[in-house]
């Protein structure tokens, strides 16, 4: 319906350009939005306010001319001018229910489009250090990143999911020292325990597996433990592989799969880090000072130059990041989205500066970043900080075990990425209307229950057929439900374009609320079979949209609860 209103306004604008009311050499694009107050109609447009200067007349006078020039259309019941010149459209009841047929015809494809036209997009997310179990912050990144991938795919993009393993650097040495200490029988309470060693129970698990000579497989790589307490390199290799496997198992339990696992260590092994250094030097963007090598990042918007290579010859963490992103570009990804925690904020400018200094024809502002804020977990109103398994933080596995995958994924994606999130375990476990994922799933299950009752009476209802005369639907609640359903395709497009999956959770919560209100107020299993069938058609459309939306969130749509 919004497209219909936009087309009518475009026609009216063209008419006013033809008669000289508006200049013919300018383009005008009406922005049509949903109204918040239904007394103002279903859709509103401010084009008269935007174009009034070009017309040389007050906005309200231009609005009157536009309304007069609108073509006749049976979908529009009436048009009103409000305030200084807003144009409000009231759609006919019959037109509102056309969306029901569309939904039932398109089924799982409803809401999808091909605007991406198959463009390749790489989304990097989670990318945790292989030094321990995934914490709840990684979980938020996984929920947001995977939902964003699903949204992009729903808009016709060819998406590659990538996980970058930081398997080189000081944190890996600390991991090796920690496991080696456990292998030798030490505990964190011993004086000789590594100063920056990891203390969680999972270190004991790694040590025991190493001593037992276990073989672990992490994605496509197999590592067998040597069981030698003195071979720190072997311990390091095994510990990284073991924890990568554990992270993979956590992600599998979370319903997240990756297409590519990229190892930081491979950048060194393949000479890509050194090649990046040489290219930056050749381009004249490096200098030596105080025994270190610096990159002139200030020439690309950074607030100060950054150390690339330290006095001891080791590279700072942002240099392999630059090499890694050059590799992404060379793989042909012109659109790259990095979903990371907000603690990576300082790396954005540095990485982009390094990429510009490479002179590789990479656009300024590439890649895109989606940075999420921290997560606080609470139980009984008190913050939960410690997991026995991890030692110092709450893990993704903890949440899945407590509340299940569906609730964990939904809650972690339910807020703006730039807002801090409080994960209330008690709320996520509750079976009440206050729990949004339960409330939404219950709407789906309720509709399935109605269909089962009809089937028990010998009345079968297909998923992709309109079974009733929709003109019999005359209630305001029915029209509001239809209007809410009609918003879904635009919501999917905007959520992907804006990189904001939380809009989908809010939409589904609102749709479920409208359905429950309607369900409680108006029976569907009634003697008037014609009206019953019309309402069942509306039910089927609601069920389909809820199922489609939950699927994009990676959440199930149960038929029974």
Swiss-Prot record:
The keyword ATP-binding applies. Gene3D superfamilies: Arginyl tRNA synthetase N-terminal domain, HUPs, Isoleucyl-tRNA Synthetase, Domain 1. One of its GO terms (biological process) is arginyl-tRNA aminoacylation. PROSITE patterns: AA_TRNA_LIGASE_I. It holds the Pfam family DALR_1. Monomer. This is Arginine--tRNA ligase. It comes from Marinobacter nauticus (strain ATCC 700491 / DSM 11845 / VT8) (Marinobacter aquaeolei). The gene is argS.
């Amino acid at each position: 319906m919004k497209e219909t209103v936009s087309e009518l306004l475009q026609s009216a604008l063209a008419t006013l350009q033809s008669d000289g009311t508006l200049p013919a050499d300018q383009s005008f694009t009406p922005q049509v939005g949903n109204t918040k107050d239904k007394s103002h109609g279903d859709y509103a447009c401010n084009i008269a306010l935007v174009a009034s200067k070009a017309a040389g007349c007050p906005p309200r006078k231009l609005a009157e001319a536009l309304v007069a020039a609108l073509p006749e259309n049976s979908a529009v019941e009436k048009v009103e001018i409000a305030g200084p010149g807003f144009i409000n459209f009231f759609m006919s009841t019959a037109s509102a229910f056309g969306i029901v047929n569309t939904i039932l015809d398109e089924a799982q494809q409803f809401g999808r489009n091909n605007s991406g036209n198959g463009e390749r997009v790489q989304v990097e997310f989670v990318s945790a250090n292989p030094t321990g179990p995934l914490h709840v912050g990684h979980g938020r990144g996984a929920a947001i990143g995977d939902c964003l991938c699903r949204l992009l795919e729903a808009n016709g993009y060819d998406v590659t999911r990538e996980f970058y393993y930081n398997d080189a650097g000081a944190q890996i040495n600390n991991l090796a020292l920690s496991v080696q200490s456990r292998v030798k029988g030490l505990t964190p309470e011993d004086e000789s325990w590594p100063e920056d060693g990891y203390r969680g129970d999972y270190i004991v698990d790694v040590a025991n597996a190493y001593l037992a000579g276990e073989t672990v497989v992490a994605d496509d790589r197999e590592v067998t433990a040597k069981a030698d307490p003195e071979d720190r390199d072997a311990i390091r290799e095994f510990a990284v592989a073991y924890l990568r496997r554990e992270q993979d198992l956590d992600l599998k339990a979370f319903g997240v799969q990756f297409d590519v696992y990229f190892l930081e260590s491979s950048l060194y092994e393949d000479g890509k880090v050194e090649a990046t250094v040489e290219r930056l030097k050749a381009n004249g963007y490096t200098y030596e000072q105080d025994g270190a090598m610096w990159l002139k990042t200030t020439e690309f918007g950074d607030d100060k130059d950054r150390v690339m290579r330290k006095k001891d010859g080791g590279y700072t963490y942002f240099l392999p990041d630059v090499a890694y992103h050059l590799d992404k570009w060379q793989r042909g990804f012109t659109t790259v989205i990095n979903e990371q925690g907000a603690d990576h904020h300082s790396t954005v400018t540095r990485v982009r500066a390094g990429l510009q200094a490479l002179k590789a024809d990479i656009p300024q502002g590439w890649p895109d970043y989606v940075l999420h804020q921290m997560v606080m977990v609470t139980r009984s109103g008190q913050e939960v900080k410690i997991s026995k398994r991890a030692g110092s933080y709450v893990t993704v596995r903890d949440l899945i075990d407590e509340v299940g995958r569906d609730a964990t994924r939904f809650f972690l994606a339910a807020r703006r990425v730039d807002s801090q999130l409080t994960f209330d375990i008690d709320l996520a476990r509750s079976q009440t209307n206050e729990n949004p994922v339960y409330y939404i799933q219950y709407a789906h299950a309720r509709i399935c229950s109605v269909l089962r009752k009809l089937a028990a009476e010998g009345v079968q209802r297909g998923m992709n057929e309109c079974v009733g005369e929709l003109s019999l639907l005359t209630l305001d609640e029915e029209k509001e439900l239809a209007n809410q359903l009609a918003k879904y395709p635009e919501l999917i497009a905007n959520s992907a374009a804006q990189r904001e999956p939380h809009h989908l959770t809010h939409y589904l919560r609102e749709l479920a609320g409208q359905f429950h209100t309607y369900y409680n107020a108006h029976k569907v299993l009634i003697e008037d079979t014609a009206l019953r069938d019309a309402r069942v058609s509306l039910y089927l459309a609601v069920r389909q949209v809820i199922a489609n939306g939950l699927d994009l969130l990676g959440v199930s749509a149960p038929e029974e609860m």
